[in-house]
Amino acid sequence: MEGKFITFEGIDGSGKTSVLKGVIEHLNDKRIDNYIWTREPGGNRISEAIRKIILNVEYTEMDARTEALLYAAARRQHLVDTVLPALNEGKLVLCDRFVDSSVVYQGVARDIGVEPVIKLNEFATENLKPDLTLYYDVEPEISLKRISNNRQNQVDRLDKESMDFYHKVRQAYLSLAESNKERIKVIDASQNLDKVIDDTLSILNNFM
């Protein structure tokens, strides 16, 4: 039996990670344990080491293509060590970010181009695509305020990007969702957390 691969996407501060925690609580309450929860970049020893490089605030001079290559490298190892074994065991894989993040952040916001980023990640993932993607949409003004309020002592390199950068990321996500309506479901993340979790569970219940 093959598992299901569900990814959670959104700009930084969209609340997707908090929603994921709510989904995990729901699964645990229902005594559902045939799942894993993971993240990108990260999810295993090598990919977590790459994550530290990518997000290090000291590396503000990092070239956009270097960044894209590091994400792809972390993604490949994450798939091999974590995602694919779980899917082959028939598990539900809940992943905080996947290829869509690279498309919008590096492909669009960093101006590398969508096609080069897609091709790079096709190589890294061997064309593996999520069965379902949940995109948490929120205005950057709201998301960055959340970051400021909640992560004052944990600022990473991406938190230092401009408002214009995050507006580009958001618009890229919306365009991606528009062209992939079957796979990507848009959730209003400006609502309170409980409502966003309820909307998420409703979509997941219909999907499963």
Curated annotation (Swiss-Prot):
GO CC, one annotated term = cytosol
Q: What does this protein do?
A: Phosphorylation of dTMP to form dTDP in both de novo and salvage pathways of dTTP synthesis.
What SUPFAM superfamilies has UniProt attached to this entry?
Answer: P-loop containing nucleoside triphosphate hydrolases (SSF52540)
Pfam families xref list: Thymidylate_kin
Q: Name one GO biological process term.
A: dTDP biosynthetic process
For this UniProt record, the keywords arranged alphabetically read as follows: ATP-binding, Kinase, Nucleotide biosynthesis, Nucleotide-binding, Transferase
Report whether Methyltransferase shows up as a keyword of the record.
no
The record's similarity note reads: Belongs to the thymidylate kinase family.
Q: What residues does ATP bind to?
A: G10, I11, D12, G13, S14, G15, K16, T17
Q: Which reaction does it catalyse?
A: dTMP + ATP = dTDP + ADP
Q: Which HAMAP family match?
A: Thymidylate_kinase
Q: Which GO terms describe its molecular function?
A: ATP binding; dTMP kinase activity
* The protein, known as: Thymidylate kinase
Q: What is its EC number?
A: 2.7.4.9
The answer on whether this UniProt entry bears the keyword Ribosomal protein reads no
